[in-house]
């Protein structure tokens, strides 16, 4: 496991910001950070990007788009949900993870030798923590903003 540094925090913050973009824009920018591929996963209001290079796979969950009612509703759906992986969690965040979960897991399982990092901002930060709890020992590090 790596230690957190300012540079790593900035690196994963950039990737978290790319999760708000379309796949073409994110692909162009992620190459500047050393990633060869960006894949958009979207289902309703839930969205994330999968970035890969030779060593790593990064799942970056998109945060709240304040102009999108579904995102705002996910944020305010703050009652507790019992998760077998993470105890009690924010119900709105949990529902958003469920929307993209199968495709995220398929991408991760397709890269079994790569180190897995998870990141996200706002709603995406909450989704990141739930995903990390579900994936447990497979995760190298989680960065939330």
State what each model feature region is.
Residues 1-119, 123-145:
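Non-catalytic, mobile gating and regulatory segments of ester bond hydrolases
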